[in-house]
Swiss-Prot record:
Subunit structure: Homodimer. The RNAP catalytic core consists of 2 alpha, 1 beta, 1 beta' and 1 omega subunit. When a sigma factor is associated with the core the holoenzyme is formed, which can initiate transcription.
The EC number(s) this enzyme carries: 2.7.7.6
Family: Belongs to the RNA polymerase alpha chain family.
UniProt region (Alpha C-terminal domain (alpha-CTD)), positions on chain: 248-329
GO molecular function, one term: DNA-directed RNA polymerase activity
Reaction(s) this enzyme catalyzes, per UniProt: RNA(n) + a ribonucleoside 5'-triphosphate = RNA(n+1) + diphosphate
Keyword terms of this UniProt record: DNA-directed RNA polymerase, Nucleotidyltransferase, Transcription, Transferase
Protein name: DNA-directed RNA polymerase subunit alpha
Statement: the UniProt record of this protein carries the keyword Nucleotidyltransferase: yes
Amino acid sequence: MQGSVTEFLKPRLVDIEQVSPTRAKVTLEPLERGFGHTLGNALRRILLSSMPGCAVTEVEIDGVLHEYSSKEGVQEDILEILLNLKGLAVILEGKDEAMLTLSKSGAGPVTAADITHDGDVTIANPDHVICHLTGNHDISMRIRVERGRGYVPASARAQNEDDDRPIGRLLVDASFSPVARIAYNVEAARVEQRTDLDKLVIDMTTNGTIDPEEAIRRSATILAEQLDAFVELRDVSVPEQKEEKPEFDPILLRPVDDLELTVRSANCLKAEAIHYIGDLVQRTEVELLKTPNLGKKSLTEIKDVLASRGLSLGMRLENWPPASLADDL
């Protein structure tokens, strides 16, 4: 097997075993060691909790005021009927919700096939039993189906309902995921001389509203879209911050008073409009000696003070004075 030791193997879809119309086993290999569990667990969590689908959210049954009751002529109590309604597998085409109706009379089972609905609604499990009638009794109900994602308990929706919610409208815990069961297994795989690789086998059962293969494809798409944000991190470059050096030595921006010259020397400099040390160092000895009342003694004092600070007379400063000082002058 050729390639860099740091290069990751790219898995391929090896086999799709269609166990039944709603169950399939999907095998992918080879995976780098440890990636079987990494990808298997991520896909499993998405398939169970993040896949969009349709579920029953509300039910109204004629003659029933609350879920903790029973209905004459029906074998099951209301809680059991609600539990059975949660098992309906519904497909909505081009809409996010629909109202279904069910009316049945006479002894026998009541199934999903007895539900009346529009043409853009499909029930994938028409043989699903909702309840059983005894004797010459009947049952009528209205069932609301909505599109959603994940699991939404009835208690969470009840908090958002208005206080004037009609008596008899029963809220149902909604599990929107079309995946009924998902399990994965990691087995050993081999490629040429490498025997430390993984094989991922995903065993999944859906409620019939989506093919198992399509469910895995959608879950992988969701995972890839979420990881896109991390991929983009490699393109974000932090600009290198260059240390900005000051245009002039800070000491040149200080006033000449900081030199602590004698009063005579300081007054002579101020008379010549020499306010900053940067102004002073640009003057030559000849220029300073032409200053009224500034003799050789004062000149020597100025030269010694500047020398103690690493400065001297006759220096050339480009772009002097800086804008910050020019505004003050």
